[in-house]
């Protein structure tokens, strides 16, 4: 039997002890930052019996993405969309790739007509980035608040009224050097919105491998481009094209055949035991690709 837990579960969940010495293979996931299996061995809070005697696999956020699917399914409901706007884009931290996308949308003339927000703006957040490959200046943007998530410390899954008035959701994921899909993408998919996800090259391909489907009228070729600056340009161009060629109701109608199926896919992928435990089998989609990339501490 294989059981999936988070690092936090390993440190704080006493139920783990009942599986000690039972022959379980542990799958330990971390979804926030990049670590390695050395992270566990260096952490003084991790029980030594676990490191020494158990068989475990460690995967960082490039591989353990079920967390955000689970959280989305539990917190988001399928919501009717009454489109007034072409798209909405909600940003928390103004990372350079997000600013570059916003700048280009503004230059192309569509940003001001659609709701967008920044919930944080600090020079250190903007300066710290692995996205220097953009090689372009980004204009500082003031805080613009549509929702109260960051202000009132409310749920990540609370959205402003403009969310349900927008035909498309632009999901600018936090990382561009790896495929890391969060609630930014999963939540609008779960709500029933056409979602254009932008992250590391292959993000949309990853979504398709998980069973999500999208209209053929949307050109996702940007997703295969490894050069970040070019990917930003192609993404902004495609968003602008859709906004020019379709009205908001037409975009909603375009996505209608996929709306319910994508929501059901999230629900299916989120079927887990309490406290993020999950029995894994070889039939779980995409087990093989990442199984070759992570190391085993075999008994």
Predicted features along the sequence, with ranges:
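Pol beta-like nucleotidyltransferase catalytic core
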Residues: 1-171, 178-299
């Amino acid at each position: 039997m294989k059981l999936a837990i988070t690092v936090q579960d390993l440190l704080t969940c006493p139920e783990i002890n009942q599986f000690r010495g039972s022959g379980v293979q542990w799958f330990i996931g971390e979804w926030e930052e990049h670590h390695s299996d050395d992270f566990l061995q260096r952490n003084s809070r991790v029980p030594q019996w676990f490191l020494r005697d158990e068989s475990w696999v460690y995967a960082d956020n490039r591989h353990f993405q079920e967390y955000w699917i689970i959280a989305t399914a539990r917190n988001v409901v399928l919501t009717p969309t009454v489109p007034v706007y072409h798209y909405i884009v909600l940003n928390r931290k103004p990372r350079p790739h997000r600013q570059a996308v916003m700048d280009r949308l503004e230059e192309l003339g569509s940003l001001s007509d659609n709701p967008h927000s920044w919930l944080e703006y600090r020079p250190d957040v903007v300066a710290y980035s692995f996205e220097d490959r953009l090689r372009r200046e980004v204009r500082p943007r003031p805080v613009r608040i549509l929702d109260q998530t960051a202000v009132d410390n409310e749920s990540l899954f609370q959205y402003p009224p403009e969310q349900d008035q927008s035909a498309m959701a632009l999901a600018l994921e936090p990382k561009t050097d790896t495929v890391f899909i969060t609630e930014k993408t999963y939540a609008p998919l779960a709500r029933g919105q056409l979602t254009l996800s932008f992250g590391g090259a292959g993000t949309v391909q990853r979504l398709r491998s998980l069973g999500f489907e999208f209209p053929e009228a949307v050109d996702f070729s940007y997703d295969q481009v490894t050069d970040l600056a070019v990917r930003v340009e192609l993404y902004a161009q495609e968003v602008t094209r859709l906004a020019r060629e379709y009205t908001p109701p037409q975009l909603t109608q375009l996505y209608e055949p996929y709306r319910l199926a994508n929501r059901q896919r999230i629900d299916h992928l989120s079927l887990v035991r309490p406290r993020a435990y999950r029995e894994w089998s070889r039939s779980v989609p995409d087990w093989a690709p990442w199984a070759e990339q992570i190391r085993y501490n075999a008994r």
